[in-house]
Regions:
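Formylglycine-dependent sulfatase
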Residues: 1-410, 415-419, 431-456, 463-476
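Residues forming the ATP-binding cleft of Hanks-type serine/threonine protein kinase domains
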Residues: 427
């Protein structure tokens, strides 16, 4: 093989802090830490839309949510999926001679129950069998499901609607399948691109093998000073039913799942080395978004705090130097970055900015930033907006994450939601507990600059949120 291979591993709902080498959460990840020590460790990788489907759409297309149309998750009751005409990284790699493979969670297809109460595939709830063809967007080898969170009893589809049911923790099983694929790839001259998306540590948190749970049975709390266990809720006003003890156990299980992923990642690295593929394979380890785990009284994702938007990213192997990359890398930046690292053409459709140069040099990139985006997507939130004649894509929040600041313009999720502008200084206030609240961006020079960047982006993307920037915020 003369061309470089790609192994792209990403977990669901895994925050940047939850890795030993990050020096924050008390999580055990020796294999990941060792990989980071000889690779390029990205300090500011960011999920631009911290939700599964929207991030994945940007990841594969190199485009922002306004362009992909992915304003929420693919879910029952909504006709939302990755459009057939989108040009994805899998298609680009296939057209340039790569064998392409996808093993694990997809979550870019529409649930089958939107069209049939009893799908032939047996898919239920949010799940779907994605048949061979354009909806796989260039991936030839397919061992996947749309979305289902039964981590200990997963199922998959290949090229028929007959599901493959498994009694094994999903990351372990998917790693088994990936290693078999690598063994086959080692015997071929053709370069490969293998994408391996693990679902854990996504909730339900307790679906994790007992040997990993035992690692954290004596863990003391709180693990972060901004955790508020008394008023837990989600990004909507919906309250969580978790007690403080529930949160403690969920956090233990969350870390346990990450330690389990660490073991599986080590198995992958060992296989690459044993098969003689390690020196010619770029390996990327990352996630689609993080998890609040009680910080600011919040659970899950879909908010602008670092626990939600901050994702791990380590890039190593095949000519990638050891070091630290300080560039703020957003969701849409990943595809053009990978293509440039592999010396492949970047389609004109891709809107993200390649970080290949910074990954190869370890540049600090003090002036780098990415855009942030979120819309209301739950059916209970969409109905009042529809009744009021309001486009849900004009609501939610938009923002900028730069090296030092996170700047947010929040219009809320309801027709009568108050506007707010928030500026977080991540150097002075890393736990984001004391934002500067502004009526207008002009009240603060830093906010004025960042809102200028935001306005240019919203105008370029024809985002219906843009007129909100002309309104004065009412929350102080």
């Amino acid at each position: 093989m003369s061309c470089k291979n790609l192994l792209f591993v990403f977990a669901d709902q895994w925050r940047r802090m939850a890795m030993g080498c990050a020096g924050q959460d008390p999580v055990l990840t020796p294999r990941m830490d060792a990989f980071a020590s000889k690779s390029m460790y990205c300090t500011d990788a960011t999920s631009s839309f911290p939700l599964c489907s929207p991030h994945r759409a940007s990841l594969f297309t190199g485009r922002w949510p306004q362009s992909t149309g992915m304003f929420t998750n693919c879910k029952p009751g909504l006709s939302v999926r990755l459009r057939d005409e989108e040009v994805c990284i899998g298609e680009v790699m296939k057209e340039n001679g790569y064998r392409t493979a996808y093993i694990g969670k997809w979550h870019l297809d529409e649930p089958e129950i939107n069209h049939s109460p009893e799908p032939l595939s047996g898919a239920r709830d949010w799940d779907a069998y994605t048949p061979p063809g354009v909806r796989r967007h260039g991936f030839d080898y397919w061992y996947a499901y749309n979305t289902c969170d039964t981590h200990l009893t997963p199922h998959y589809w290949t090229d028929s609607p007959e599901p493959i049911r498994v009694e094994q923790w999903s990351p372990e099983h998917e790693t088994d399948v990936a290693i078999r694929y690598l063994k086959d790839a080692a015997e071929k001259e053709q370069p490969f691109a293998l994408f391996l998306p693990w679902n854990p540590p996504h909730s339900p948190y307790h679906y994790v093998p007992e040997q990993y749970r035992q690692l954290y049975k004596d863990l003391k709390f709180p693990v972060r000073e901004n955790v508020d266990a008394e008023h837990l809720h989600y990004h909507t006003p919906e309250a969580s039913k978790m007690t403080e003890e529930d949160l403690q156990q969920a956090t233990r299980d969350y870390f346990a799942a990450v330690s389990g992923l660490d073991e599986q990642f080590g198995r992958l690295l060992d296989s690459l080395k044993e098969l003689g593929l390690d020196e010619n394979t770029i390996v990327v380890l990352t996630a689609d978004h993080g998890d609040m785990m009680g910080s600011h009284g919040l659970m899950a994702k879909h908010v602008w705090y670092e626990e939600s938007i901050g994702i791990p990213m380590i890039v190593g192997g095949a000519g990638i130097p050891q070091g630290t990359c300080g560039k703020v890398i957003g969701s849409a930046d990943v595809a053009p970055t990978l293509l440039e690292l592999l010396d492949l053409p970047v389609p004109d459709t891709m809107e993200g900015r390649s970080a290949a140069k910074e990954l190869l040099t370890g540049a600090a990139c003090e002036d780098s930033f990415t855009y942030l985006y979120a819309c209301p997507g739950g059916l209970a939130l969409l109905e009042p907006l529809q009744k009021a004649g309001i486009d849900p894509k004009s609501m939610g929040w938009r923002g900028i994450r730069s090296k030092r600041y996170t700047y947010i313009v929040d219009a809320g999720y309801a027709p009568d939601s108050p506007m707010q502008r928030l500026l977080y200084d991540l150097q002075q206030d890393p736990m984001q507990q004391a934002p500067q609240k502004l009526r207008r961006a002009a009240e603060c020079p830093e906010a004025e600059v960042l809102e200028g960047y935001l306005a240019e982006w919203l105008e370029r993307e024809h985002d219906p949120f843009l007129p909100k920037l002309n309104k004065e915020s009412s929350v102080l």
